[in-house]
Every structure is written in structure tokens, then in C-alpha cells.
């Protein structure tokens, strides 16, 4: 159920039986999932939780909204790093709803960078760097041209052996580059890694 823009872990099964068992396991929310998301703004708290129903936006089949209608969803968020005007968050969903993290972040006023569906704008170097000089043709490419959401870790019980399985995926290169430029040019009070 990953969005096509989300980088990171993709899980494939070798048989229909494995697919069915993994599907049952994931559907029962018995796995532990961890995402990293770069957002506009900064939460007041170091950790916070959003418990808000998620439902479809009328007339928009690809957009979900957090509010009073829809299915219950819960996501815990932890600050990983603060940068002036931006924050890298660890996202720990305990339910599995379409666009859950993105809708919950929009609901809290912290839209994901690059996520036009959920209120985020593209990350442009010209907005960060003083004395920025564009290319000769005057164009500028965004530092990140997708929603800044990365599937970093998945823990679950193997469907046949019962062994604990943990899969980790390092941050995608485009997000690493975006963070490099943010660390260099978007510094300020309260910026930096959180211990």
C-alpha cells in the first residue's frame, strides 16, 4: 500500500500462500513500521500522536483527509532533526490507512515537503541560499521532486517460521541531498539533531 512516490522498503512474496499470510499479518497491524518524513514547519513537542479518522475527499479519489469522518487511524511522530523552517520526523503508524501519515501531517499543520496533495511545496535551493544563481537558461530543478516520505524500517514475524524479521533501508539519495542543503543553508535557533 505504498504511494508510488514513497522511497524505501518494498516487500515482495515468492508464492501466493506467502502473499496471503503476509497480507493477513499486515492487515492485522501486527508489524512495526517506521517512516521518515521531511516536513514544513516544526512541532512544539519532541513526540506527539495524532488519532484522527481518515476519509476520502469528495470528488478527489486520490486524496484523503483527517477529520470526523472515515476510519480510525493513529500515528506517533518523533522529532529526528530540526532545521530552520523544516523538521525531519520519525513516523510510527499503528494503523494502516491510505495516505495516513501524509493526511495526519497535513491535519497538524506540518505538510510533507514536496507533497502538493497535502499542502507541501517543492524544496528549491533558491529559497534557501543567499545569492543563488540560476542556470544559464534560468530554470531551476527542485532539490526533491516528490513527497519527502521514506519507508525506513519494517519488523514482522516470518509467516512460515515465526522468526522475527527486521528490514531496514537507508535514506533515499534525493532526501539525503535535500537534508545536506538544508543543514548547510537552513540553520537557525533550535536547528540540529535531537539526542
What are these regions (language model features)?
Residues 1-195:
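RNA pseudouridine synthases
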